[in-house]
Amino acid sequence: MKILKFGGTSLSNSELFFHVATIIENNLNNEQIAIVLSAPGNTTNLLEIAINQTINNKNIIPIVQKIEKNFLKLINDIYQVEQKLLYEKIKNNIENKLLELKNLLQGINLLRQCPDKIRAKIISSGEYLSISIMNSILISRGYNTTIIDPVKKLLTKEDTYLNATVNIKISKFRILSMKIPKHHIILMPGFTAGNKQGELVTLGRNGSDYSATILSVCLNSTMCEIWTDVNGVYTCDPKLVSDAKLLTSLSYREAIELSYLGAKILHPNTIYPIQKFKIPCTIKNTHNPSSIGTKISCNHVKNKNLITGVTYLENVHMFSISCLYSKNIETIIPKIFSCMSLSKIWIILTIQTSSQNTISFCILKTMTNTALHVLHKALYLELKHKLLKPIKVEKKLTLISVISSDILNNTKITEKVFSILKHVNINTLAISKGASKNSISIVVKHDDGILGVRALHKGIFNKNCTAEIFLIGIGRVGQTFLKQIIEQKNWLKSKNIDLKICGIANSKNFILNLDGINPKNWKRDLNLSKKSFNFKHLLNSIQNYYLINPIIVDCTSDKNIANQYISFINCGFHIVTPNKKANTTNWKYYEDIRLAAQKEKKKFFYETNVGAGLPVIENLKNLLRTGDTLIHFKGILSGSLSFIFGKLEDNISLSEATKQAQSLGFTEPNPKDDLSGIDVARKLLILAREVGYKLELKDIKIEPLLPKEFNNISNTTDFITKLKELDQIFCNRVKKARKLGKRLRFVGIINQKGNCQVKIDEVDHNDPLYNIKNGENALAFYSKYYQPIPLVLRGYGAGNNVTASGIFSDVLRILL
């Protein structure tokens, strides 16, 4: 025997009714099937609206007409396909139900209230019509059926009409006494049962699910399947957390805990019957029948992560009741729980407090007024004689819970939870982990709820080394960086590294997608974007997201962006950049960036500031960390000038060599910036500061390559034309050096006293810079450890590929 229950989203239209009928047929494999159905679509909600509008003397005709229209359309659409359908019989059932509904609503209108007995009759109407329609479909397909009337067969324990529980023993006897033939498909409306007087009552929240598990026990079934609109139970609400993972297996205890603490799955009352009788239950997706679903049983596969899921309850209020004397609290607590229980107010959990004379507990917002009333009544004398402080209620809270199989015995989980919340600056108002060994619950402000849930889920379940990259500047280097990430996709995946491009900005446009920008469409999306990069806008966009390793990658040469680095760091971002402006501005800002990074425990990597892809900065730092000291430095620090001066050796003119360097991408858009020597001076300043010299850019002496009259030329074409005037001068200098067995090189020098100079130098064949050309950089460090032969770093110091690879390397250094 197998029980199949289908919810309202599985029965919203004729296509879904046929689809459900097919699922039923596919399950008729050597075992009997029993079906429990909810009302179609949003029928129950419409019925609730009709009741409330009637009480408030509002026009209900449109609501009733909508309900009637929905059902008539449903059976008409079914009849168009299933000609054998008992159409007139179903139509009469619908008309009779609607007539009964109208009469009941008329009575409510006269009373100006709705007794629970009447409410139960009205809100359960849809389930009976679902059964009538499905029964007719199955009969038209040649199947024999038996319908169980839950009002006659399921006996409830209490006299309540709206939230009843079922007496399983008597109900089971009644149903088994029906002696239903084995070849019959059994159908039963969900959500309802009968009291001792034989009156219809409802089973509360998730009532149809409860009906299914009760029927499973009553029919001695081997499996209960709950068919809904999701693939099963997830590690978190997939509507809130896009990468929530499907849980294929749960224990009964875990399922109860998840449900109790906010997961939108089965209600705890639904699980208790199958837990007691050890009946497995699988949650399946009507729209995706092939999905494995989530199986709840006593033989579940244990979660390797130890943690089952993260749940949340919104609209929670926290009550705090304090005694003046700690000895009185022991007499107060039973009174509190007794009056709350009698009033059927659900205490979600009690809270640990540091004070021994205070008890705190959480309830749902909807019960707050009732709770205050019953508490003031129960504790009247204590409050009157001021043995208690006034009852304190803290509102607008969210309860976040982490469910684990054995959380109390695993302190690492608790430590991780608080570490993650601290990382995103969420203040914990209260903690509870004593009520159950399977969960820890944290009370936070409502505004922190979504961020807290996302942060905990990502921090707990993300097993990859993840970085969220916000790329500013999408010129040649920026585009090459993106290309390299795409090309290394398989390697990154093999190392469990997830680099998500979450933002891309140029001088005009900005796109943002915290789930990751599609690398194939970024150009189109950026061009279509009407937003420009604004750091405040970025912060507003990410405030409800937990970013594991957010990295600003600044591929601009923009001073304004560089001036925001401290703000980036203080807001939780690492920084990777080839932009030299931040490291070559005034010494105070240079120092403040490093202090901010140290304080916030963030990385500020700028390896590409000096040698593009060459590992210059980190190697220099390693030397100094191990006690080495710099005696002398000499290097070719410009790929463009390396190329140009190399071409001069090949008897190519200065102007022609500069044009070639520009066409190959070695120079800035205007080559004047390269030939001014300022770029080399900036790199030299960065190296000098790394060594410990507190210098400013003005302290670097630059031997200008160009006469002063070149400074006013902004047009690139005009500049190249004007440059021809210097061709002969440089040709003569090359010849002069050649006669001496030397070559011209444009170098940066740091001497032992920290004096820095940028100049054209004549180097002989013993100099490590002698053979450097074609865009190569070479840096010779003479130190206490490396002399008389220096440590030389040599390689291409310009070009899109090597610069982008240096940026890529810095990003990976943050993760690895």
From Swiss-Prot:
GO MF term list: aspartate kinase activity; ATP binding; homoserine dehydrogenase activity; metal ion binding; NAD+ binding; NADP binding
Database matches in PROSITE patterns: ASPARTOKINASE (PS00324), HOMOSER_DHGENASE (PS01042)
Ranges where the record places region Aspartokinase: 1-250
Function of the molecule: Bifunctional aspartate kinase and homoserine dehydrogenase that catalyzes the first and the third steps toward the synthesis of lysine, methionine and threonine from aspartate.
Region forming the signal peptide: none
Positions bound to L-homoserine: 668, 679
Keyword Glycosyltransferase: no
The organism of origin for this protein: Buchnera aphidicola subsp. Baizongia pistaciae (strain Bp)
Region ranges (Homoserine dehydrogenase): 472-816
Name of the featured protein: Bifunctional aspartokinase/homoserine dehydrogenase
UniProt-annotated binding residues for NADPH: 477, 556-557, 580, 799
Pathway: Amino-acid biosynthesis; L-lysine biosynthesis via DAP pathway; (S)-tetrahydrodipicolinate from L-aspartate: step 1/4; Amino-acid biosynthesis; L-methionine biosynthesis via de novo pathway; L-homoserine from L-aspartate: step 1/3; Amino-acid biosynthesis; L-methionine biosynthesis via de novo pathway; L-homoserine from L-aspartate: step 3/3; Amino-acid biosynthesis; L-threonine biosynthesis; L-threonine from L-aspartate: step 1/5
Cofactor notes: A sodium ion is seen in the structure; a metal ion may subtly affect the relative position of the nucleotide-binding region to influence enzyme activity, and could increase the stability of the enzyme.
Domain of life assignment: Bacteria
Residues annotated as catalytic: 683 (proton donor)
Subunit structure: Homotetramer.
Binding annotation for Na(+): 607, 610, 612, 614
Swiss-Prot/TrEMBL cofactor(s): a metal cation
Keyword line: Amino-acid biosynthesis, ATP-binding, Kinase, Lysine biosynthesis, Metal-binding, Methionine biosynthesis, Multifunctional enzyme, NAD, NADP, Nucleotide-binding, Oxidoreductase, Sodium, Threonine biosynthesis, Transferase
Family: In the N-terminal section; belongs to the aspartokinase family. In the C-terminal section; belongs to the homoserine dehydrogenase family.
Matching Pfam families: AA_kinase, ACT_9, Homoserine_dh, NAD_binding_3
Lineage: Bacteria, Pseudomonadati, Pseudomonadota, Gammaproteobacteria, Enterobacterales
Parts of the chain that traverse the membrane: none
Gene that specifies this protein: thrA
Binding sites annotated in the UniProt record for NADP(+): 477, 508, 556, 580, 665, 668, 799
